[in-house]
Amino acid sequence: MLPAPLRGAATLLAVLALAALLTTVRHNASAYLTGVWDTGSQTLVYGRIHQMEQGQHAPGGFLGVYTDDWSDDTNRALFRDDTPTDAAAFHPYTHQSGLQGWLFGRVNRLLRHWLPDGLARETALYWLNSTLFYAAELLVALAVWEEFGPLAAAFGFASVLLAPWLQRGMKDLYWCLWTWLLPLLATLWLCHCTCVRGKTPRGCWPLVAAACMVRCMCGFEFITTFLILCEIPLCYAAAKAYFVRRDPHGALVWLGRTVGAGVSALGGVTAALALWFAQEWLCFGSAADAWQNMTRAVTDRVSLTDGAVRDVNVPQVLAQYFRESTEPLLQFGPVSVTAWQLLLFALLVGAVSVVVCLRRCTAAQLVPPCIVWGLGLAAPASWMVLSKAHAAIHTHLVPMLWHFAFVPISCMLLPVLAKLMIPGRKKDLVASH
């Protein structure tokens, strides 16, 4: 039996190897074979990479472009063709810190030693981004396996492999979908350490804060989504302690950890805001101008103040996302599943589970999975409520948003609920901690 550190290192290496294999076999690094997602936003990263490649600098270190129209493909061409550019022509995009641009810019400069061709370096960056996303999803699947068993983990991970928009979008250099999962991974690690050691190590709290800070430095969009993702494992643990193990004190302890994780997450968000403000100050030269630009960026994205951006209300946005979008969330050959169809199916399965478990007097065991499912639905829906104009405009985000975390949770819980309904199985689904 290997020591725990060696087991952890071996597991991480195996996850990275499998993630790299999946990226290669499924051609996720190829813009030609699996397509691209949001070229309009990704061009901001290409501009920043090209700026670093040219050895140029601008105050603040933001993403940006060298063209007046930043929604076209010109900046990507500048990067791929190594076209010389004028430093004064760079237009910074100041609505976020742009950490992903700095990160990929550094990696790109390293890749130049082996890949002088711009197209080859672009493919390598896509490959890295997709591999990191698969690795994050595999780590989540391992946590699901530990708690619910291999079948639930397989169903959850299958939702990634069968999601056409994830397969296309995981390579995107702007959105960096693997960073959306960092807060969730941090709290999953917190729960794991707590269960193994009997108490929460102090280092877990700054880890949660750092995960949220990194995500926010790559963009504050969908902030409520990944903050709710961050709390799902802890809410599940609290519900399981109260309803399944009948341990009110244990439930209160887990609720305290939920609050602690929330405070840590908000601390990470605050740190990201402070760094963003410092960048704005460097860019605009004064605190007043920096504050004005920040508040304008925020008010354009908050439902209470975004009326000037687009005249739309929250029910309209919810209808657009739930009912009007016909984009498939899951695709298996000719069979596709939309958000509305998956929601109805999940509600039907849930209703049957409630009836069966009530008859078998095991309804209490349904509460924790139902809380997980409800939070999985609330995570994407919360952004539609918080930022209705942004959600209404960016229709290409509609099918992607559901995968954080409504789709994988709905798939994961199918075998969990089936296990609860099988006659003769009344013991706990997971080991108690």
Listing of model-derived features with the role each one plays in the protein:
Residues D82-T123:
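Short hydrophobic/aromatic helix or loop-helix immediately within or flanking a transmembrane segment
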Residues G118-Y126, G156-L182, C212-M213, M217, ...:
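Aromatic- and kink-enriched transmembrane "portal" helix at the membrane-lumen/periplasm boundary
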Residues A136-A141, E327-V367, L414:
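Hydrophobic, aromatic-rich transmembrane alpha-helices
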Residues G203-F222, F226, S264-A265:
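Membrane-interface alpha helices of multi-pass inner-membrane proteins
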Residues T258-A346:
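Membrane-lumen/periplasm interface segments of specific transmembrane helices
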